[in-house]
């Protein structure tokens, strides 16, 4: 540890309050591998060992930055940073020693400094403020589609054509509600967390039947460390079902591990990926999650969804028809959800956490899909995935405004800013799985 400065004569209380100084080496040792977890924000060192379990955003997301500088993710994720800092005072244990740099040598200082200037510019431009009318209209269009689905059966009967049309409309409702709950979950609609949380519960719980706490727990980790093995839950299918990226498959091959025939994963992806994720996994796991963690408020919101659809569709369809409709909707929604959410990340760099700077962390793991009215609607503006990852609390209707500024920053520092057509993005998922599988096979057979 860097030596503390020599105490100067003064009141005893002043000496007790004397600042402790630490080095990056000391901080890095408190990464949670043992008992202690420290992190750094604006050169101040915080001990989060006990607090991590009480962290409102989830215990894992904050622990993923243990032993590291967390200044940029702290700024990115919190909308009321002044209030949060007051609660952080009890965790403060010292500062970085004066001779220590402001962040680790693995991070690009010039890039980080310029991104922080860009962040300040974005805030001055008002791009972090939401247009509430946009989100109101978006919610209304979801509710209208929901009503239209029920009216289709009520007016035209339950024969095949109205039944299929109803299923398509309900699938659209579920997909679009998924994008809208994402907005509220990221605190990007209202200026206070309270209103965002309330509407998040309504949309994800009552309109979709899923728990807000589960989404927070999973999704914030993804944003904190995208495509980082054992830190991003979105790539937890590695290595049980898939070998992902270019680094991890080679590791598996060299270790002679074969949980699945990965060289065929680009084929079985169509069976266990898009069609199965929601109806065969998420649909059941979310109930285990809320009961195991005693999230009774979430459970109540979820049950309100099931009660609503049961009492509105059972009288029209009967039990068998209702269950058939429900699982067809989940099947269609699952395909929509998986293709859209994976197109931005699976073809990109996947590795262990290398503790690089915020911009590099997000750009190496993320790509965009070209803007169009359809692409924006179909993906819930997640075609602007780069901008969303750099500024997760930014309202989605402002992504296209900040995109040129991000492109300029990337060009200046030689960072690839990748954007592609929608169908190309879908195809790249399959191509990347095929390439990863071949890398695994080569390492498995020859290394």
Curated annotation (Swiss-Prot):
One GO cellular component, as annotated: mitochondrion
InterPro entries: Cyt_B5-like_heme/steroid-bd, Cyt_B5-like_heme/steroid_sf, FA_desaturase_dom, Fatty_acid_desaturase
Lumenal side stretches: 146-160, 290-308
Chain ranges of the Cytochrome b5 heme-binding domain: 19-97
Keyword Ribosomal protein: no
Induction of its expression: Expression in liver is down-regulated by dietary PUFA.
Pfam families: Cyt-b5, FA_desaturase
Superkingdom field: Eukaryota
Transmembrane segments: 125-145, 161-180, 269-289, 309-329
UniProt-recorded name of the protein: Acyl-CoA (8-3)-desaturase
GO-annotated molecular function: acyl-CoA (8-3)-desaturase activity; acyl-CoA 6-desaturase activity; omega-6 fatty acid desaturase activity
Record organism: Mus musculus
Organ and tissue specificity: Highly expressed in the adrenal gland, liver, brain, and testis, tissues where lipogenesis and steroidogenesis are active. Expressed in colonic mucosa.
Localization of this protein: Endoplasmic reticulum membrane; Mitochondrion
Family, per entry: Belongs to the fatty acid desaturase type 1 family.
Lineage: Eukaryota, Metazoa, Chordata, Craniata, Vertebrata
Deletion phenotype: Knockout mice die prematurely with no survivors past 12 weeks of age. This phenotype can be rescued by adding arachidonic acid (AA) to the diet.
The keyword Acetylation is annotated on this UniProt entry: yes
């Amino acid at each position: 540890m860097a030596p503390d400065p020599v105490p100067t004569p003064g009141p005893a209380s002043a000496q007790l309050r004397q600042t402790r100084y630490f080095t990056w080496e000391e901080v890095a040792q408190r990464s949670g591998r043992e008992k202690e977890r420290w992190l750094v924000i604006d050169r101040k060192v915080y001990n989060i060992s006990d607090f991590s379990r009480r962290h409102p955003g989830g215990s894992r997301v904050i622990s993923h930055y243990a032993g590291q500088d967390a200044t940029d993710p702290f700024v990115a994720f919190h909308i009321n940073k002044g209030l949060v800092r007051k609660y952080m005072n009890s965790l403060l244990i010292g500062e970085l020693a004066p001779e220590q740099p402001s962040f680790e040598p693995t991070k690009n200082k010039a890039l980080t400094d310029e991104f922080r200037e860009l962040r300040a510019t974005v805030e001055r431009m008002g791009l972090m403020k939401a247009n509430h009318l946009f989100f109101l209209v978006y919610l209304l269009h979801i509710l209208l589609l929901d009503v239209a689905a029920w009216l289709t059966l009520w007016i035209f009967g339950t024969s095949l054509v109205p039944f299929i049309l109803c299923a398509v409309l309900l699938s659209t409702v579920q997909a679009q509600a998924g994008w809208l709950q994402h907005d509220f979950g990221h605190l990007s609609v209202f200026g206070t967390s309270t209103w965002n949380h309330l509407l998040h519960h309504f949309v994800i719980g009552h309109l979709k039947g899923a728990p807000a706490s589960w989404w927070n727990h999973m999704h914030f980790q993804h944003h904190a460390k995208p495509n980082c093995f054992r830190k991003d839950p979105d790539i937890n299918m590695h290595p049980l079902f898939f070998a992902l990226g270019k680094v991890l498959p080679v590791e598996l091959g060299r270790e002679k591990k074969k949980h699945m025939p990965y060289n065929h994963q680009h084929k079985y992806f169509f069976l266990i990926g898009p069609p199965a994720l929601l109806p065969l996994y998420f649909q059941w796991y979310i109930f285990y999650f809320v009961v195991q963690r005693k999230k009774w408020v979430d459970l109540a919101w979820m049950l309100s969804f099931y009660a609503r659809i049961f009492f509105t569709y059972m009288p029209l369809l009967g039990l068998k028809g209702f269950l058939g409709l429900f699982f067809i909707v989940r099947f269609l929604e699952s395909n929509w959800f998986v293709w859209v959410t994976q197109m931005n990340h699976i073809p990109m760099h996947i590795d262990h956490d290398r503790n690089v700077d915020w911009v590099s962390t997000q750009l190496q793991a993320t790509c965009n899909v070209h803007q169009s009215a359809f692409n924006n609607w179909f993906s819930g503006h997640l075609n602007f995935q780069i901008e969303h990852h750099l500024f997760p609390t930014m309202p989605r209707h402002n992504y296209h405004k900040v995109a040129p500024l991000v492109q300029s920053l990337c060009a200046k520092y030689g960072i690839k800013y990748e954007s592609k057509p929608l169908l190309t993005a879908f195809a790249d998922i399959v191509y990347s799985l095929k390439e990863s599988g071949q890398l695994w096979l080569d390492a498995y057979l020859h290394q």
